[in-house]
Amino acid sequence: MGNDTIANMITSIRNANLGKIKTVQVPATNITRNIAKILFQEGFIDNFIDNKQNTKDILILNLKYQGKKKKSYITTLRRISKPGLRIYSNHKEIPKVLGGMGIVILSTSRGIMTDREARQKKIGGELLCYVW
């Protein structure tokens, strides 16, 4: 039984948001790099750094907060498809999150992308997570 790196990344970000922690370290894999890139492009995180410590590749995410109370830009981050229950969708059935305010991150045959990109390119895939 292997580790679910996507669930580990989501849980680390969620826990850091609850504790108002600015940086999060997650194991760097191709999937976590692509998810971090999407979160950065959509404005949910400030930036991310691909760091190599000893023999481990680590991805350092700088989370984004607003105001003096440090309200997080990421309200909810939830895993959809899990290793025990994969959930796939074609481009017509990809769910809209909060009427388009949030995003769904998908793994497609053309890489990891947001729901808007997948609808535009008319391709479906595995629904990885919701972000809003």
From Swiss-Prot:
Keyword presence, Zinc: no
Keyword Calcium belongs to the record: no
Cellular component aspect of the GO annotation: chloroplast; ribonucleoprotein complex; ribosome
UniProt keyword annotations, A-Z: Chloroplast, Plastid, Ribonucleoprotein, Ribosomal protein, RNA-binding, rRNA-binding
GO biological process, one term: translation
Family: Belongs to the universal ribosomal protein uS8 family.
Record-linked PANTHER family: 40S RIBOSOMAL PROTEIN S15A
Function in brief: One of the primary rRNA binding proteins, it binds directly to 16S rRNA central domain where it helps coordinate assembly of the platform of the 30S subunit.
Record's protein name: Small ribosomal subunit protein uS8c
Originating organism: Marchantia polymorpha
